[in-house]
């Protein structure tokens, strides 16, 4: 009796499922047969009342197979009706192609990122390789190896950020320049020359005003080989500044003093009719620095330079206040930022 009843229900349900014309109708059919009070659900419950074990197994197997077949049919019909519904909706929802597009907010490249990319590109065209080093450094790499005397003002706590705790029994500082990277590069060198690197990165000094920031970006350059002289340095600096600011830029070198270079120079560019603005520091690597990293100063020589990224960006893009770089104001970035298509390819 149960066998014939379930097969009749199968035929009836199959016919209703295939003839359903909407998702709502299909859902009501599903509930009618498989809901808590559904007709097929009732058949499943009645299997437990069959006393003969073999018959109960046979009927149960048949009912489960029919249930699986009907549920598969419901899912198939559901997909079919869903596609029909979407197609009908697409036909109704016509798009007016004459309407203007919605405005899109396009991200812009920060001036510092743009400047870093451009400076790296210029020096890579001269054969300089990219190097990096830790921002948290010991005094040897930041000061001692760079021929900076124990009483030098740069080592005072009002100029430099020192950690209170010692690391391996050494005082640790937030690096004040990326010159520490040149020390690590020369220490790691195993007689492979030339050493020709640039080291961009963040540096830290205890200063904060319109032209100074406690954290800023610097690029260190280093070239070590036999017979390197001041002429090589001047050519390199001239090449960079003319590529960065334009061929018509006027450049001058002034004598200066840095403990890690001898001779040392500061480089200015002309702004307006009379004004000269310092742009970077440079010089020939001091003999003591080469000796500190086990390079024979009688065999090898070289030059180094340091460029403040914020400084050259302010001059090139006419930005008056360095602190604006870190203000996180969207209006400022929209004004001074760059489209990514402005990046030169490296």
Curated annotation (Swiss-Prot):
Named cofactor requirement(s): Mg(2+)
Keywords of the record: Aminoacyl-tRNA synthetase, ATP-binding, Cytoplasm, Ligase, Magnesium, Metal-binding, Nucleotide-binding, Protein biosynthesis
Gene Ontology cellular-component annotations: cytoplasm
Coiled-coil regions, chain positions: none
Catalyzed chemical reaction(s): tRNA(Phe) + L-phenylalanine + ATP = L-phenylalanyl-tRNA(Phe) + AMP + diphosphate + H(+)
Binding site for Mg(2+): 262
Subunit-structure text: Tetramer of two alpha and two beta subunits.
HAMAP family per UniProt: Phe_tRNA_synth_alpha1 (MF_00281)
Listed PANTHER family: PHENYLALANINE--TRNA LIGASE, MITOCHONDRIAL, PHENYLALANYL-TRNA SYNTHETASE
Protein known as: Phenylalanine--tRNA ligase alpha subunit
Annotated source species: Ehrlichia chaffeensis (strain ATCC CRL-10679 / Arkansas)
């Amino acid at each position: 009796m149960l066998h014939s009843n379930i097969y009749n229900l199968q035929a009836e349900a199959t016919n209703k499922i295939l003839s359903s014309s909407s998702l709502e109708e299909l859902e009501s059919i599903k509930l009618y047969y498989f809901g808590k009070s559904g007709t097929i659900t009732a058949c499943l419950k009645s299997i437990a009342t069959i006393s003969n074990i073999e018959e109960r197994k046979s009927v149960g197997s048949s009912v489960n197979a029919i249930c699986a077949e009907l549920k598969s049919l419901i899912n198939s019909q559901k997909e079919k009706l869903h596609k029909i519904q979407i197609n009908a909706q697409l036909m109704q929802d016509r798009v007016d192609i004459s309407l203007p597009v919605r405005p899109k907010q396009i991200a812009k490249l920060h001036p510092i990122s743009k400047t870093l990319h451009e400076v790296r590109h210029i020096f890579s065209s001269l054969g300089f390789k990219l190097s990096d080093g830790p921002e948290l450094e010991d005094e040897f790499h930041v000061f001692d190896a760079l021929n900076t005397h124990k009483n030098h003002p740069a080592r005072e706590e009002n100029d430099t950020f020192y950690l209170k705790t010692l690391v391996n029994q050494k005082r640790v500082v937030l690096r004040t320049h990326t010159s520490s990277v040149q020390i690590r590069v020369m220490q790691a060198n195993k007689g492979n020359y030339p050493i020709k690197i640039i080291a961009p990165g963040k540096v830290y000094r205890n200063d904060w005003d319109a032209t100074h920031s406690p954290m800023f970006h610097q690029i260190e350059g280093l070239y070590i080989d036999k017979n390197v002289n001041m002429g090589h340095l001047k050519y390199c600096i001239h090449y960079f500044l003319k590529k960065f600011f334009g061929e018509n830029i006027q450049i001058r070198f002034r004598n200066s003093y840095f403990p890690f270079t001898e001779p040392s120079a500061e480089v200015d560019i002309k702004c307006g009719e009379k004004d000269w603005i310092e742009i970077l520091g440079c010089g020939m690597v001091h003999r003591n620095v080469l000796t500190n990293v086990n390079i024979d100063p009688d065999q090898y020589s070289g030059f180094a330079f340091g460029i403040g990224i914020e400084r050259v960006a302010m001059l090139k893009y006419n930005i008056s206040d360095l602190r604006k770089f870190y203000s996180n104001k969207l209006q400022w970035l929209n004004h001074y930022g760059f489209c990514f298509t402005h990046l030169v390819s490296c």
